[in-house]
Amino acid sequence: MLFLLSIACGPSVDAPSSSAIKVGDDGAEIDTSAAGISAFVASKAYKTWAAEANVHTATKTRPHGHVRVFFNQTSTVALKQNQSSLPVGTMVVKELYQNDGATLSGYAAMVKSSEKGWTWWEAFLPNLDKPAAYGIDLPGCKGCHSGPGNVDQVLSQVP
């Protein structure tokens, strides 16, 4: 399954240079380099964000299997206001689970890093410092996230 996820999102393409973007509900910044996103996810700082109530099966068109999605305040406000273009600083973190829906296997994150696009990141335990996918507007990530029902690449409903 991990191989399929790597193929779905694709390898690193057009990796962005390190830059800091405000994503924290308290104005905290995140370094959008692969190492910066890895460190942010490993810190579990996203756990204070709005989140789906439970782990659930992703739809058949999504490669992530079982997921639980967390939304930063920027994304929560924009999605609740039905904005069609989300602001820079929007961040969504997905916890990825094995088929049993209980065993955490990795994470995927997306950060609106510019008005024109998203920085995508995906890594699997125990190697969060070695992402399977990382870059700006990765074709595999964009391919799925551009599907029906998306709001500026976000497919999940804010809780």
Task: Tell me what each language-model feature is.
Residues 5-8:
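C-terminal motif of bacterial Sec signal peptides marking the signal peptidase cleavage site
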Residues 70-72, 79:
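Small cysteine-rich, disulfide-bonded extracellular modules of the LU/uPAR three-finger superfamily
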Residues 10-30, 36-65, 77-159:
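Sequence context surrounding c-type heme c attachment/ligation sites in exported
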Residues 1-2:
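Sec-dependent signal peptide recognition
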